[in-house]
């Protein structure tokens, strides 16, 4: 079960870092209509 806990922690950390960078520096992608 420890492997599952370590995997969950790893995914959570990566997700937090990704969202932090995403919100701090919005991606400069070409707008294809929509929002």
From Swiss-Prot:
Where is the chain membrane-spanning? 3-23
For membrane topology, the record states: Single-pass membrane protein
Coarse class of the protein's main subcellular location: plastid
Cellular localization per UniProt: Plastid, Chloroplast thylakoid membrane
Subunit structure, per the record? PSII is composed of 1 copy each of membrane proteins PsbA, PsbB, PsbC, PsbD, PsbE, PsbF, PsbH, PsbI, PsbJ, PsbK, PsbL, PsbM, PsbT, PsbY, PsbZ, Psb30/Ycf12, at least 3 peripheral proteins of the oxygen-evolving complex and a large number of cofactors. It forms dimeric complexes.
* Role according to the record: Found at the monomer-monomer interface of the photosystem II (PS II) dimer, plays a role in assembly and dimerization of PSII. PSII is a light-driven water plastoquinone oxidoreductase, using light energy to abstract electrons from H(2)O, generating a proton gradient subsequently used for ATP formation.
UniProt-recorded name of the protein? Photosystem II reaction center protein T
Q: Which organism is it from?
A: Metasequoia glyptostroboides
């Amino acid at each position: 079960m420890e492997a599952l806990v370590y995997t969950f922690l790893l995914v959570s950390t990566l997700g937090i870092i990704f969202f932090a960078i995403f919100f701090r520096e919005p991606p400069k992608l070409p707008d294809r209509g929509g929002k």
